[in-house]
From Swiss-Prot:
One of its GO terms (molecular function) is malonyl-CoA decarboxylase activity. Acetylation at Lys-472 activates malonyl-CoA decarboxylase activity. Deacetylation at Lys-472 by SIRT4 represses activity, leading to promote lipogenesis. The modification N6-acetyllysine is found at K59, K168, K211, K389, K472. PANTHER family: MALONYL-COA DECARBOXYLASE, MITOCHONDRIAL (PTHR28641:SF1), PTHR28641. The keyword Lyase applies. This is Malonyl-CoA decarboxylase, mitochondrial.
């Protein structure tokens, strides 16, 4: 099996569920901390295999299984987030690439090129350089993957590493590089050829339904009747499992089968279907309304993209006439971004330049207070949706601002919003922004009740994805572009 390393068979990948560990306090100081750090250094010295000389790379025996098992056991015994972060930081900093070897091999390649030596000599020198660029800890990860449950352990280890980085317990280029190396290895082990597409129905095993319910991160499942609706008529639920662990969800996709592109999430997750028997002639659109990763250690591994592509093919087989594919997506971060803009406007200008004069006047008349402070108070809660006048008054400016947030706000040239970036990378079109599309508490406080449709025109997804990834061009509908133009005209930024 490509990518799993010699000798790794299907039985090696156990279900990717580890018991949760409490984060605990930071690393202790004093004698206890010193003893723990010395134990870490000794463990790493024994567990991380040395890099064999280039000539012996295929003749050196693998390290004893016990050495890798010792690392797994030691790491599993660290209950505190800070302790695990300390060990991972020491691994990244002390067992990466030998920079001296890299410099030496690079000089050798350059020298051979200048001498215009024959291709075979140059290719071998380049292979030596490539070998020198492999960090030592990669060997540790490779050998751990051969242990029973080893890949499961590495998925959890990467989840811990990402958490430690987010908490700033461990930082630096060495740590980022190790994260990238481990992500690359996991991407090979979890590539699409090793993944099974499984559909969930009400007759699926109870433990699968329970896992799907627990994994739902976008629109939480309230009870068993709620779950039954989401896998019942006019609904589909699919997940990827690894070929060695059927029935163990890695990433989950929920789909609504409708007559048009949905604009309200409550109509999907709360309302009962029109009938218990599906009328196929009424199903013309497939709406992807939730996608959830169950393993945080697999962040950045392209499971979601592969899952959508596989589900589209599955739905086309079941409904050959199905022609419309779209998401109904949350807009996480919009309210936070807007509140940040309001705060900066107050500090820099002392007035609101996001809303037109007439909009400011209307909102002030309804609320009876100064526009900036009132808006910050309103948007920090969900109470404003109780006022029909406020809902009407805020619709035009918030739609305009949301369009700009999705289309115009960038991070390194790509969409700032992570959900937008995901669908645009897949080649979807930013199709429509929907007002009062999610009136749940989470929807109102997180994105002012707004949601977006990203539409997948199947024949255009390839060119759109290439255009976005290569030229950073966002394909958007007339509705979105019109709202963006209004923002640029009316908001004095």
């Amino acid at each position: 099996m490509r990518g799993f390393g010699p000798g790794l068979t299907a039985r090696r990948l156990l279900p990717l569920r580890l018991p949760p560990r409490p984060p605990g306090p930071r690393l202790a100081s004093g004698q206890a901390a010193g003893a723990l750090e010395r134990a870490m250094d000794e463990l790493l010295r024994r567990a991380v295999p040395p890099t064999p000389a280039y000539e012996l790379r295929e003749k050196t025996p693998a390290p004893a299984e016990g050495q890798c098992a010792d690392f797994v056991s030691f790491y599993g015994g660290l209950a505190e987030t800070a302790q695990r972060a300390e060990l991972l930081g020491r691994l990244a900093r002390g067992f990466g690439v030998d920079h001296g070897q890299v410099a030496e091999q690079s000089a050798g390649v350059l020298h051979l090129r200048q001498q215009q030596r024959e291709a075979a000599v140059l290719l071998q020198a380049e292979d030596r350089l490539r070998y020198a660029l492999v960090p030592r800890y990669r060997g540790l990860f490779h050998h751990i993957s051969k242990l029973d449950g080893g890949v499961r352990f590495l998925v959890q280890l990467r989840a811990d590493l990402l958490e430690a980085q987010a908490l700033k317990l461990v930082e630096g280029p060495d740590v980022r590089e190790m994260n990238g190396v481990l992500k690359g290895m996991l991407s090979e082990w979890f590539s699409s050829g090793f993944l099974n597409l499984e559909r969930v129905t009400w007759h699926s095993p109870c433990e699968v339904l329970q896992k799907i319910s627990e994994a739902e991160a976008v629109h939480p499942v309230k009870n068993w009747m709620d779950m039954k609706r989401r896998v019942g008529p006019y609904r589909r639920c699919y997940f990827f499992s690894h070929c060695s662990t059927p029935g163990e969800p890695l990433v989950v996709l929920h789909v609504a089968l409708t007559g048009d592109i949905s604009s309200n999430i409550q109509a999907i997750v709360k309302e009962h279907p029109p009938s218990e028997t599906e009328e196929k002639n009424k199903i013309t659109a497939a709406i992807f309304y939730s996608i959830s990763l169950t393993q945080q250690g697999l962040q950045g591994v392209e499971l979601g993209t592969f899952l959508i592509k596989r589900v589209v093919k599955e739905l086309q087989r079941e409904f050959p006439h199905l022609g419309v594919f779209s998401s109904l997506s949350p807009i996480p971060g919009f309210t936070k971004w807007l509140l940040g803009l309001l705060n900066s406007q107050t500090k820099e200008h002392g007035r609101n330049e996001l809303f037109t004069d007439s909009e400011c006047k209307e909102i002030s008349e309804i609320t009876g207070g100064p526009i900036n402070e009132t808006l910050k108070l309103l948007l920090s809660s969900s109470e404003w949706v109780q006022s029909e006048k406020l809902v009407r008054a805020l619709q035009t400016p918030l739609m305009r601002l949301c369009a700009w947030y999705l289309y115009g706000e960038k991070h390194r040239g790509y969409a700032l919003n992570p959900v937008a970036n995901f669908h645009l990378q897949n080649g979807a079109v930013l199709w429509r922004i929907n007002w009062m599309a999610d009136v749940s508490l989470r929807g109102i406080t997180g994105s002012c009740g707004l949601m977006a449709n990203y539409r997948y025109f199947l024949e255009e997804t390839g060119p759109n994805s290439t255009s976005y990834l290569g030229s950073k061009i966002i394909k958007a509908s007339e509705q979105v572009l019109s709202l963006v133009a209004q923002f640029q005209k009316n908001s004095k930024l």
